[in-house]
């Protein structure tokens, strides 16, 4: 190949190493040198600018794969665990209740057995006492309460006043009643009381007296324990009614006799709730 000599630069041939030429063998073509020497005194032109980089190739965006669904096996295992825990607590509560019930039943059976043994023992002791004739131990005698409450006696027509000691609300215990008097059997402190109910169809304001006496062989005459007097107690010429009540504590001795006197027996109302006489030991 010829080239004109007046061309400032030699021609450059680019040969593809992969191509085959019918004119030359692959080994006879050599690559061009990287630079071509210039002539002396000639300015070398600047090298051509490098080619711009190819634009980046945008790959088509692909959608993200969907999240895998939650495992049904794990959910089932969790539910099964909760069910087992609940069943365990239910069984535990049932066992505790059963244990408490058994304990209460055992305790009740034990108490019942003890009661049966105690009753059997008492029955055996009683049977033995009856068989051998062993008397029971003497129990302490309860001291009788010294008390008396006498009520008015409608047919009383004498002084001292007579009283009812048996019927109605009357009672006598630990003392004696004899001919209108209460007889003391035991020395001590006693509360003595008496009430007399006076009434009349026509008032004349005559003085009324109500007295409680005690009589004892140690004294030459009877002693007045209590006394009540009434004067100007009603309106002249009209119906009237008044009560006289006496009560106090006395130290009485054995064999003392207590009785009641009034100044006007005919004006006394002998109803049991209105006229009475009594005492009790403190």
Swiss-Prot record:
Q: Name one GO biological process term.
A: positive regulation of canonical NF-kappaB signal transduction
- List site positions: Cleavage: 82-83, 130-131
Name the CDD domains on file.
TNF
What is this protein's expression induced by? Answer: By IL-18.
Where is composition skewed (Basic and acidic residues) in this entry? 119-132
Q: Which residues form the signal peptide?
A: none
- SMART domains in the cross-refs: TNF (SM00207)
The protein's assembly and partners? Homotrimer. Interacts with ARHGAP9, BAIAP2L1, BTK, CACNB3, CACNB4, CRK, DLG2, DNMBP, DOCK4, EPS8L3, FGR, FYB1, FYN, HCK, ITK, ITSN2, KALRN, LYN, MACC1, MIA, MPP4, MYO15A, NCF1, NCK1, NCK2, NCKIPSD, OSTF1, PIK3R1, PSTPIP1, RIMBP3C, SAMSN1, SH3GL3, SH3PXD2B, SH3PXD2A, SH3RF2, SKAP2, SNX33, SNX9, SORBS3, SPTA1, SRC, SRGAP1, SRGAP2, SRGAP3, TEC, TJP3 and YES1.
Q: What is this protein called?
A: Tumor necrosis factor ligand superfamily member 6
